[in-house]
Amino acid sequence: MPPDLDVADPEQALQQFLGQSTWNERAALKRYRAMMAKQFARRSGIFIIDDTTLPKQGTHSVGVARRHCGALGKVANCQCAVSVHYATAKAHFPLDMRLFLPNSWLDDPARLDKAGVPEEERRRLSKGRIALELLDRARAEGLPGRIVVADAGYGVSGPFRDGLAQRGLSYICRRDRRQGRLRPEARVGSARPVDRSAETGGRARRRLRR
């Protein structure tokens, strides 16, 4: 909150504005992205996809569950959001973020109602599907870029990688140790990891590229 704003409790006022006031979140984000793109967007821009975890103590925050928490480096009670960032040689900034809802929430309508989760946000989506939707939204607004970078949590997903290829996007994804590398000739929709560590006498490569 602006330091000169005359309110008794600025932090509480901000929480009330964000959580209870009526305002168009998507319109605000669209305006923010347009402002940042005007200054920093480049054709060589890179989209970065990753999890953002928010440690929590209770059980009432939307989407909270016990899972690996990157912020703490261990399994803990936390929220998990899919985030998309944009990077160029001159700048790096967040584009969008959406909470991931695990089955423990989606299978409990009463819990969703109590937390005030809108009906349109109750879809059963993988994190990869959420990431693709966030990418589509940013690119539909004209943000340039043809390369996506993602961690292993996304790189292990064939539908996610295929979705990127179908959109004409190249990608660099970390992979799980149990995966091999993709054949260079693999086609969209039929790509399968191939472990060639035995052929090379060493460990399999740990990145997937297309």
Region annotations inferred by a language model:
Residues M1-P3, G45-Q57, V84, V148-Y154, ...:
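Short, conserved catalytic/metal-binding motifs centered on acidic residues
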Residues V7-A8, R42, K90, P144:
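Short, well-ordered coil loops that connect the C-terminus of an alpha-helix to the N-terminus
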Residues A13-M35, K127-E133:
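Charged, flexible boundary elements
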Residues T22-N103, D108, D113-K114:
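Active-site-proximal, Lys/Arg-enriched surface segment
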Residues A110-R210:
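An internal, acidic/charged active-site-proximal segment
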